[in-house]
């Protein structure tokens, strides 16, 4: 007679190729994977999802056969809510394992909020004597859920354009940039910045009010 409970590994939030996710962006699916730790025959696994560990208030206990991963479809995420995956195993004798819960996966459905962009490395500048260097600094972008992953900047001769930088350039999480270009006399250059959070939501673009080259002076 088999009276021993089977065992099951702690589930990971996300598909098996993604490891354990802490945050999830906009999606209509929720993926879970786990390890079947028991060396004896498992009859089936069950999974559920709740907003606290062990709870089933989002998805009730559902049979998953002997598969150790599942992608729940038509899953409605709510921004800022943390979802916990729960797993339990049954062996051939009908013994049930203890319930194991993930450490949670928080839905981040919103893009970062934007801040400001100044021309120059301090207070906003209107003119520059440099024929080769453009500088800008920015701050007050924020993402209170998954956090900001990186910033991108672009430089153009019209607000929001990137004809000088030839597209968007990633600058990690730095809050300033100093770049070398060949600048033309009496041309106004604009620096644009956008932020991407840790689930790849992208903020709106913020553009400086422009800095004009002046090589000759008074």
Regions found by a protein language model. Give the residues of each.
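Short, solvent-exposed loop/turn segments at the edges of extracellular beta-sandwich modules
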Residues: 90-96, 196-201
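Structural beta-strand segments of beta-rich domains
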Residues: 28-32, 132-136
């Amino acid at each position: 007679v088999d009276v021993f409970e089977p065992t099951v590994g702690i589930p990971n939030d996300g598909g098996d190729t993604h490891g354990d996710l802490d945050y999830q962006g906009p999606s209509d699916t929720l993926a879970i994977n786990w390890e079947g730790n028991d060396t004896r025959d498992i009859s089936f696994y069950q999974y559920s999802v709740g907003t606290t560990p062990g709870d089933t208030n989002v998805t009730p206990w559902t049979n998953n056969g002997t598969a150790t991963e599942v992608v729940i479809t038509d899953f409605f995420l709510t921004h800022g809510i943390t979802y916990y995956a729960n797993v339990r195993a049954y062996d051939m004798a009908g013994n049930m394992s203890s319930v194991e819960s993930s450490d949670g996966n928080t839905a981040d459905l919103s893009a970062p909020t934007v801040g400001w962009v100044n021309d120059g490395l301090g207070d906003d500048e209107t003119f520059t004597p440099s024929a080769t260097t453009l500088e800008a600094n920015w701050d007050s972008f924020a993402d209170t859920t998954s956090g900001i992953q990186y910033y991108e900047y672009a430089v153009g001769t019209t607000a929001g354009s990137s004809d000088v930088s030839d597209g968007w350039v990633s600058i990690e999480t730095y809050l300033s940039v100093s770049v070398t270009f060949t600048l033309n006399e009496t041309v106004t250059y604009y620096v644009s910045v956008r932020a991407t959070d840790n689930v790849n939501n992208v903020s709106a673009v913020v553009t400086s009010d422009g800095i004009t080259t002046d090589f000759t002076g008074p």
